[in-house]
């Protein structure tokens, strides 16, 4: 795995092996090195910059929510991100009616599941199963979320309609992701 010329481990990055265009790494996969284990910390400590160089580490915190805020033009989410708010606590406050100052970690975790679940298309059944609640309660949470951020529902509906008409969707960078299972036209 160590290159004999450079003395370094080199990975191969590709954007063409995943349907979504998400960056993938192999030979070896350097994107999924554990951080919470002793072995993971030891592996990570081997990454050092050449003299006079620096390593850049980027944490795309809540990137999916930031992207949906942008592409769907969700003012409430954009404002929350601009103010540096904890978006999961803000969602919990709105969906569950709990003041942010009194946020229980379990309620925040449930809001996190709602935030990510909805943008990935979770159903009331799926959310109920994930949170251990009734399907009726899950539907109420989803409806409350969509009432708070109606732009997300419109964006999702428009995207589904586009996919039905064209057989693909476009990423924010113009990449076509072909979708099977829809009648084109």
Question: Language-model features: where?
Answer:
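Catalytic nucleotidyl-transfer cores of nucleotide-processing enzymes
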Residues: 1-90, 94-109, 125
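Conserved catalytic core of nucleic-acid polymerases
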Residues: 10-11, 15-18, 93-185
